[in-house]
Regions:
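Glycine-/small-residue-rich active-site loops that bind phosphorylated ligands and cofactors
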Residues: 54, 130, 187
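A structural signal for short, well-ordered beta-strand segments and their strand-loop junctions
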Residues: 48, 71-73, 124-125, 179-180, ...
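Cysteine-centered iron-sulfur cluster-binding motifs in ferredoxin-type domains/subunits
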Residues: 125-135
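Conserved Radical SAM active-site core
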Residues: 98-117, 121, 136, 140-225
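Flexible, acidic/Gly-rich N-terminal and inter-domain linker regions that tether
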Residues: 2, 7-8, 12-121
């Protein structure tokens, strides 16, 4: 699906499946849903912005990528993202973007079930909630009530939390590992919001830090010069 005015494509893998699913229902549901299923709004046609998230560089950058988007001011991202009665799969066919300012905590200890990387200093953070993709096997479908995407624009707060933790590691002789794509595919967002490249530059300033970026995206050209 092509977002007008953005100059790039956002993957949309569910519209066809959703259409087939809806049209297979009873005639009443089919009659009501058919025009909407066929004519979804483009992805990110609407961007919700927390009132406290406007004065950030990432907010300005993101809004500049979508000059035709309808911008809606909200009090808190959960008012939209966590509201009841949402349909994850339908929303995936017309995703909306939510820009928010995260509050503490900015860093979480990793579960004992994850790979240890040979160090006890393993953490994750959540600069983005949800994903552009909609993989059948992904746990996010059962984790979030919404198919929309939340981006936390106060990236410096995430990095400051890591700086503090580096001074109080469980084992200071071993590196700290932080997964920055635990609840998203951050690399898939790089042409929209260049978070991966910013995190790479941050890691270059640290001596005892490794970040993990898990991705199925092929947008490596977007970080070649980082």
């Amino acid at each position: 699906m092509q977002q007008k005015g953005s100059g790039f494509e956002i993957p949309n893998y569910t519209a066809r499946n959703c259409k087939q699913k809806c049209l297979s229902q009873n005639s009443t549901v089919t009659k009501y849903l058919k025009p909407f299923v066929i004519n979804f709004q483009p992805n990110f046609s609407h961007i919700y912005v927390e009132r406290d998230a406007f004065d950030f560089e990432l907010t300005d950058l993101t809004l500049s990528k979508f000059p035709r988007a309808t911008v809606i001011k909200i009090g808190h991202y959960k008012d939209v993202f966590n509201r009841p009665g949402q349909d994850f799969q339908i929303q995936k066919s017309s995703m909306k973007l939510i820009l928010a300012k995260k509050t503490e905590p900015f860093l979480y200890p990793a579960s004992d079930m994850v790979q240890e990387f040979g160090t006890p200093n393993v953490y994750y953070n959540t600069p983005i909630l949800n994903c552009l993709y909609n993989c059948d096997y992904c746990y996010l479908q059962g984790m979030y009530p919404s198919g929309n995407v939340v981006v936390f624009v106060n990236e410096n707060d995430f990095m400051d939390a890591i700086d503090l933790k580096l001074n109080e590691l469980d084992d200071p002789l071993k590196p700290m590992v932080v997964s920055i794509s635990y609840n998203t595919d951050i690399m898939a967002m790089e042409n929209i919001i260049p978070m991966t490249s910013r995190w790479i530059k941050f890691v270059d300033t640290q001596e005892n830090l490794t970040i993990e970026v898990r991705t199925k995206s092929a947008l490596f050209s977007s970080i070649n010069n980082t």
